[in-house]
């Protein structure tokens, strides 16, 4: 494959299309209700509020098993999701901040350990982002700091 004399060569798309046809994903399902416990071991739940992600996990009791990994990307209510995970036997293994369209979001990997974690209230606001301080993590923490400072001023 290459470009010769300003002409593109043909690309064989048959194999990628055949592979895509074999992927069977449940559609129009409520949360994980259409997923069987043995269907996958890694789940991505993204693009919704942290409170909804917590409700999705709570509604599927079979996810409380150490063999599953969860990649979670809450758009809002991140604090609520972190609190749910800490209080329901999940551990946040790693967490990163990513910037998209001027907003900074978190993406976390969580696993079930069965042990509830006593988390410092500050953990609900910044999670594990302080462990890997790159530009997006610093921006996320700075934004959270402003929110906390404003809340403190409003209380005065």
Language-model segment annotations:
Residues 40-47:
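Short SAM/SAH-binding signature in class I
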Residues 30, 48-51:
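Gly/Ser/Thr-rich helix-start
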Residues 34, 39, 51-156:
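Class I S-adenosyl-L-methionine
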Residues 8, 14-40:
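S-adenosyl-L-methionine
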